[in-house]
Curated annotation (Swiss-Prot):
One of its GO terms (cellular component) is plasma membrane. Belongs to the AAE transporter (TC 2.A.81) family. YidE subfamily. It is found in: Cell membrane. The lineage of its organism: Bacteria, Pseudomonadati, Pseudomonadota, Gammaproteobacteria, Pasteurellales. InterPro entries: AAE_transporter, RCK_C, RCK_C_sf, Transpt_YidE_put, YidE_YbjL. It comes from Histophilus somni (strain 2336) (Haemophilus somnus). PANTHER family: K(+)_H(+) ANTIPORTER SUBUNIT KHTT, TRANSPORT PROTEIN YIDE-RELATED. This is Putative transport protein HSM_0534. Coiled coil: none annotated. It is a multi-pass membrane protein. It comes from the Bacteria.
Amino acid sequence: MSDIAITICILALVAVIGLWIGHWKIRGVGLGIGGVLFGGIIVAHFMNQNGLKLDAHTLHFIQEFGLILFVYTIGIQVGPGFFASLLSAGLKLNGLATLIVVLGAVSVFVLYKVVNVDLDIILGIYSGAVTNTPSLGAGQQILTELGIENANSTMGMAYAMAYPFGICGILLSMWLIRLFFKIKVEEEEKQFQKASGQDKESLTTVNVKVTNPNLSGLRLIDIPGFDNKDVVCSRLKRQENISVPSADTIIAIDDVLHLVGEINALKKMKLVIGEEIDMPMTHLAGDLRSERIVVTNEKVLGKRIKHLGIHKKYGVVISRLNRAGVELVPTANTALQFGDVLHIVGRSDTIGNATSIIGNAQQKLQQVQMLPVFIGIGLGVLLGSIPFYIPGFPVALKLGLAGGPLVVALILARIGSVGKLYWFMPPSANLALREIGIVLFLAVVGLKSGGGFVDTLVNGQGLEWMGYGMFITFIPLMITGIIARLYMKLNYLSLCGLLAGSMTDPPALAFANAIKEDSGIAALSYATVYPLSMFLRIMSPQLLAILLWTAM
C-alpha cells in the first residue's frame, strides 16, 4: 500500500475508535465528538511503540481541510441569527458570554506570567479548557506564523490534558451555583414563563371588532399601528363575507379584523380599533384558504415582498414568515431568503398562482448547491490569508483558516442569496459536513500529539497542565455565574444555557436541558450566545498568542 493509502486507513481506524469512545456516557454526559481526539492518541501511542510513521503532508492537508469544513458549516448554520443575537434581548446574554471569554483570556495571561508556562502549552491548555476545537486550530496556525516549532503536537497534547475537566468544569459550575443560591428549578421555570411576555414572543392572532367611530371610512394603512409594521391584518369579515384586505381597503364599523402579531403589539391595536371577540376565522369560509409555502424559486431570492406583486395580482396576503425557526411579522420591505416559510391567505382560485411565483418545491430543500459552498470556502481562505499589520506586533494578524471561512460564512448566510446562488444548506447536509470536518481535524491532532501523551501524563507535567486547565475553566464560569445571578437576577435555566453556550459545548447543553426537561429555556440562551462565543473563541487564541509573544 502507498503511504497515502496507509494514512487514510489509519485515520478511518482513529475515527471508528474515537466515535466509539465518544458514545460512552456517565450520567448522560460523555466526550461526544471529542472522543476522536483520544482515539487518535491511543492509536498514535501504539504506532510510536512500533516505529510506524505516516505521510506528514497528507496529515497536514486533512487537518486544515477538516477545520475549514467545520468552521464554514458552523457559520452557515448560525449566520442568519448571528447579527440579530447581538441586539435586544440577546445583548445581556452575549455581554455575559463575552465576559466569560475575556476572563478566560485574563486567566491565561496570569498563568503565563506567574508559572512561566510555554506559549504553545498554555494556548493548548486554554483551547482544551474551553472545549473549543476551532480555537486549537487557530492557535496552531498563529504559532506556526510566529515560528514556534512543534507547536501542533505540543498544543494538541496540552489540549487533550485539559479537555476532560473542561466538560466536567461546566457541569460543576452549574451545580455549585444552584447550591450556593439555593435555587428551586420549578420556581425558576415559572418565573421565566411569567417574564417571557416582556421578551420576544412568538406570534399570535386575535379577532377585533371595529367599534371606534373615528376609524370609519379610513383606509386600513391609515389606522394607527399598522404603519409600524408590527401587526398584519390577514382577513376581514364584513357581515357574512370574509375577504383578504389590502392596505387601501376602507374600514367600516362592525368589521371584524383578524390580526397577527406579538402580544404587546396586539394589545395596543385593540385599544385603537375596538373590542376583541371570540369568532373563529382560522377555518376560512367561502373560497378563501390559507397555506404554508416555502421560498425555493431562485428568481424571488432577495426580492422585497412588495415587489412580488402577489397581493395586487392575486389578492394574496403573507401573514407570517418563519426564518430559521424564528417567526417574524412580514412587512412590504422584507427581503425573501431561500427556505423562508410563508403563511399566505387568499382565494382558492388564485393562491396557486402565488405559490408558483414563490416556489414551494419541497425537493429543493433537500438539495445542496455545491457551487456556493466552494465559493464561500474559497473566499474564506482568501480573507483568512490577508495580513493586518498592527504597529508593535512582531507578525501581521490574520484571521487564518479558522477565522476567515467563519466570517465569510456568517456574512453569506446573513445575505442569504446573490442572484440564483443561495447559501441555504439543508440541516442534514450541514451536520454531515460539519461532523466529517471535525472528525478529520481531531483525528490528525490526536495522531500528532499522541506519541508522547502517556509519557507526559505519567512522567512529565501532565498533571500540572490539568490543574492549569481547571483554573481556566472554573474561575471565569463561577465569577460570571455569580455576577449574572446576584446582580443581574438572571434566570437559573437561562444561566445554565449561557454557561454551556459560552463554552460552545453540546454535552453541557444536554446536561442543562436535563435539569428541567421540555422547558427549552437553556437551549434558547445557548442558541443566543453560541454564534458570538464561537467567533470569540476562534479569535482569542490568536490575539493572546501575539500579545504574549510581544510580552516575552
